[in-house]
């Protein structure tokens, strides 16, 4: 698992990173964590930045040294160095009021401030800086983070908040046709599918996903035809795979963390379905319109490998 988290100050990056680390530790999977504040600023000096080259070198060293990690921060350039290692990219944007409230309620951060009093004295400056996120054009702005998100070709999700209900929120926005086209990524498809299978079971999930994807495509100005839009066999295959995945998951792990585990594994590979079904068959008009049985292998995670890695 490799995850990079970006967003405004107060968006919940550190909190989400902590939740991920705790969930992985509970599952006996060690994972390293890097707060980019610790490499962006000179140690022991308030608001004295390090050279971009030195900070970038530290990020690269961290990412290359650890197999499993979480990197979080508001520094677009530094997160950009982390995404070179193909992590899951999480962009958190809860809105300015939520960020301001989180900053006001933030506990003392000893790695940034000598005391809680010192931190509180700088609160008004921080709040002003948080408000400026939406209008600035620098490396630490909404504009920079959006550009990073949109240009990244790996697995990515844009979240409305960091709470453990972020997946509920994404599923609700899917059902309301309120997920913008640029945010309806491969990763979003997968975790929304997982949420539906977890909530409704495979059969009802397929019905709801079929209707929801068709409506969302149309809300984006797309069409569902014999050559574009909703694909029945792809959706049905993923529903079966996700149901098997959930059967093998730790039941004491929250569904949002199981979703991140899913994205970190081989089942999230974009071409994984070709392990079960030939390209010509899966990309056919018939497969788009109705269910076609796979022609290469039965849909069985335990019995299937993808590039030498077991899917089970």
Task: Locate the predicted segments by residue.
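A glycine- and Lys/Arg-enriched "phosphate-lid" helix/loop adjacent to the NTP-binding pocket
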Residues: 93-140
């Amino acid at each position: 698992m490799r995850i990079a988290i970006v967003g405004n100050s107060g968006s919940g990056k550190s909190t989400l990173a902590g939740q991920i680390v705790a969930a992985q530790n509970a599952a006996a999977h060690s994972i390293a964590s890097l707060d980019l504040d610790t490499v962006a600023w000179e140690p022991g000096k308030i608001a004295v930045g390090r050279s971009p080259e030195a900070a970038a070198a530290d990020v690269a060293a961290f990412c290359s040294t650890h197999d499993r990690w979480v990197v979080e921060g508001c520094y677009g350039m530094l997160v950009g160095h982390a995404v070179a290692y193909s992590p899951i990219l999480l962009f958190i944007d809860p809105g300015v009021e939520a960020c301001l409230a989180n900053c006001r309620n933030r506990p003392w951060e000893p790695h940034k401030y000598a005391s809680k009093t010192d931190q509180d004295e700088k609160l008004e400056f921080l709040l002003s800086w948080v408000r400026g996120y939406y209008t600035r054009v620098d490396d630490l702005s909404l504009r920079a983070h959006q550009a990073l998100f949109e240009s990244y070709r790996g697995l990515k999700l844009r979240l409305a908040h960091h709470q453990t209900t972020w997946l509920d929120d994404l599923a609700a926005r899917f059902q309301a046709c309120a997920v913008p086209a640029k945010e309806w990524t491969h990763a979003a498809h997968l975790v929304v599918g997982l949420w539906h299978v977890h909530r409704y079971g495979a059969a009802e999930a397929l019905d709801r996903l079929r209707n929801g994807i068709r409506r969302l495509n149309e809300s984006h100005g797309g069409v569902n035809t014999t050559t574009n839009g909703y694909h029945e066999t792809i959706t049905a295959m993923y529903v079966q795979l996700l149901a098997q995945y959930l059967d093998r998951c730790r039941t004491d792990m929250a569904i949002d963390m199981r979703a991140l585990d899913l994205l970190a594994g081989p089942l999230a590979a974009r071409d994984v379905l070709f392990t079960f079904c030939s390209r010509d068959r899966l990309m056919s008009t018939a497969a788009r319109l109705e269910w076609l049985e796979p022609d290469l292998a039965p849909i069985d995670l335990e019995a299937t490998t993808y590039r030498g890695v077991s899917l089970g």
